[in-house]
Amino acid sequence: EIASCLVGSEMCIRDRGVTLIEMMVAVLVLSIGLLGIAGLQAATSKYKINTWSRSSASLLLSDLSERVRINPDAAGTSFAGEGVTTVSEYLLADDWATQQASGLTITTNCETTACTTSQRATYDLLIWRQRVRDSMPQGAALVSGDRRNGLDVTMMWFDKEQVDDPNSATAALVTAPVCSGSETGMAQQTCCPAAASAPAGVRCARFTFVP
């Protein structure tokens, strides 16, 4: 036993050396375990951000559809309006970069001021765009269509993990597929419209709703 060995004896020194090696091995094993945990947390965080953004997109779509239903006269031609064509005022056509630079200034607050249907649509879009920006990384959106044919909504957000090789230290951001009009299924739901001019790293999620 180390406790009973003579101080300075060969046996005592040997036992102390074995104990030191055991401690070093234990530290090495612990370090490897901690690195594994850190890697797992990083991967979990990556998928959590993407899942969170998609979940936010669904909530934002519900928010916009409710606003349009409350103010339908500003959403363009209705089913009953045969022979009459009006353009929806719930439209967003600016590309991704332009929206990032927009100040989203509200000039008329329709929560405290009586607004026309047109003013309400403008207010709704500004509030909604603020929520898009706050809910998703560098969030932006495109909105087209009308209440007769349905409103097409494209949500856009920046995802730093959208790269060509996730396992490479020199991975580069890639550009999402641009919609051609012939896509189906998941490809149709995740392509970015050409009008968005989405840069590398931006993901898109497309939806359609009829008020």
Regions from the language model: what does each represent?
Residues 24, 52, 56, 62-211:
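Flexible, low-complexity segments enriched in proline/glycine/serine and punctuated by aromatic residues
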Residues 1, 46, 117:
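Generic anion/oxyanion-binding catalytic loop in active/binding sites
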Residues 14, 18-62:
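Aliphatic-rich helix starts adjacent to a transmembrane/signal segment
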Residues 1-13:
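Single conserved hydrophobic/aromatic residue that forms the stacking wall/gate
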